[in-house]
Amino acid sequence: MERKQGRRASYDRILIVSEGSKTEPNYFREIRATYRLHTANVEVRPSELGSAPIQVVQYAQALFEDGDRHKNIQRRAFEKVYAVFDRDDHDSYHDALALAASLDGKLKNDAKQPIRFQAIASVPSFELWLLLHYEDIQAPLHRNEVMRLKLHIPGYDKGAGNAFAITGEHLAAATQRAEALAKRFSAHTEPEPFTAIVDLV
């Protein structure tokens, strides 16, 4: 969600749709507030179709294409759309990745420009991104192991609205570790552990 320079005076309009209804939306809203990004430029919404990866991608597509007048979201009013979800044990994980890839550059916004449509997946879960702020993780993790995050953040609670404030001082380390994981596992069809959250922060 970093500021773009040169191409235009304002930010790209970004839509982020997440699997979770608290943890991920709160994290991205906290970043938006920290960097004083206007809500008109960065819209963060949980999926209303369900939490399966394919449902998250489908909801992101529908919200982009149709908008939502009840939420004051205009049709096709974004340059970038991100669908954020976990691998977990979801059967639709690979279908969601494929659908997002098929939409990238194919949908056009209200300025008739092709948009970026990207799946932001984490294996096993979003908490891996937070854990990377404190640990250099190379081996696969069980979902429950990710909760050792509480060793670094006593009292950590999923959905709390202060995760970015707590972990922010270690952002550079997390970014470096996440990018290293992506390179290490780029040849694998099923990378683990992995998180693309770094692409948004």
What are these regions (language model features)?
Residues 20, 24, 49-61, 192-196:
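Phosphate/oxyanion-binding active-site loops and adjacent basic polyanion-contact surfaces
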Residues 1-15, 25-47, 66-201:
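C-terminal accessory helical subdomains adjacent to catalytic cores in phosphodiester-
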